[in-house]
Amino acid sequence: QKGEGYAPAEAHREEFHFSAPYDVADGEPLQQSNESNYITDTRDYLLRKVNENPELLIISSATPEVFGFMEKERKACGNQYVDVAIAEQTGVSTMTGAARGGAKVIYPVMATFLQRAYDQLEQDWAMDNSPAVMPVMGTGIRALTDLTHLGFWDIPMITSIPEIVY
């Protein structure tokens, strides 16, 4: 568990797993904004689509906060939201299987963790040509943490797989 010994992180483990700069005294973000951004826009879009289409399934690999799905949003989706834990391979396989079964699937996934699912991207998704959408989040050469969370290998990796439009 993360956050041991820091009261705000112990009280709000999920929010502190991935956080913007904050005031150490109270754990509050240094900058707060009510402006829309890519995360809030993605969250709002997904929630709207879930309400419009009972066949929509949203999948996460233990990173729902990257597309704005905190506990409230996940509960609002009911059984239209599935978290496969830290298992991107399972996420891609679940995405393709559900799509082949008729579900409309969206699987937002972090770029930095996508290499874990290369075989499934190629063999489950591309070769099967399953109709699904996979927004890749956190792409780019800048990361809030360290080199392990840079998200720039997604482009050469995914574009090397025939049948996937990226």
Q: What are the functions of these language-model segments?
A:
Residues 3-166:
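Thiamine diphosphate
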